[in-house]
């Protein structure tokens, strides 16, 4: 749900994850390949209207359902332990929110005012805000705002890299 903040972000990353499950399911006798292909097809159709500038939005119901579908796919093909690698984008997005919240509350209690690790959480919104905060000086030029479409493409590339790492991990076992 936290990843559904930019046009096409949650659905495009889920296409990568569902495609991975389709490829892996072919080697098993689970019989979920038609379902995984249907999810990929539905998301690709949805992406036509959800990429920047989006005219259709997923909402909480859609994003939470996709999370449940990912979990069910992993359980059916017995690859639950690969979820932290494969779904690393979703994991980092959620961790950024938790880190920001806990750090803000901790610094508010300690210093009387809350401080931030990121300019904004979840992480994808951090790259949309100008200025430097925390580790920002190492990642991005000062006052450099990254366009929404570039952020989504970078997350796609990271998702592809994570899927390849997951396949390599799967083959090493």
Map each language-model feature to its residues.
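Alpha-helical transmembrane segments
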Residues: 1-173
């Amino acid at each position: 749900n936290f990843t559904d903040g930019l046009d096409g972000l949650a659905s495009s990353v889920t296409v990568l994850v569902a495609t991975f499950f389709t490829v892996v399911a072919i080697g098993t006798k689970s019989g979920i390949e038609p379902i995984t292909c249907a999810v990929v097809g539905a998301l690709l159709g949805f992406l036509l209207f959800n990429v920047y500038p989006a005219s259709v939005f997923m909402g909480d119901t859609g994003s939470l359902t996709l999370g449940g579908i990912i979990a069910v796919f992993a359980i059916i093909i017995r690859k639950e332990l690969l979820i932290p690698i494969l779904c690393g984008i979703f994991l980092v997005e959620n961790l950024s929110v938790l880190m920001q919240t806990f750090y803000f509350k901790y610094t508010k209690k300690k210093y009387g005012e809350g401080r931030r690790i990121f300019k904004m959480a979840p992480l994808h919104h951090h790259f949309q805000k100008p200025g430097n905060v925390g580790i920002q000086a190492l990642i991005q030029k000062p006052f450099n705002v990254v366009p929404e479409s570039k952020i989504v493409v970078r997350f796609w590339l990271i998702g592809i890299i994570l899927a390849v790492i997951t396949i390599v991990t799967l083959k090493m076992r």
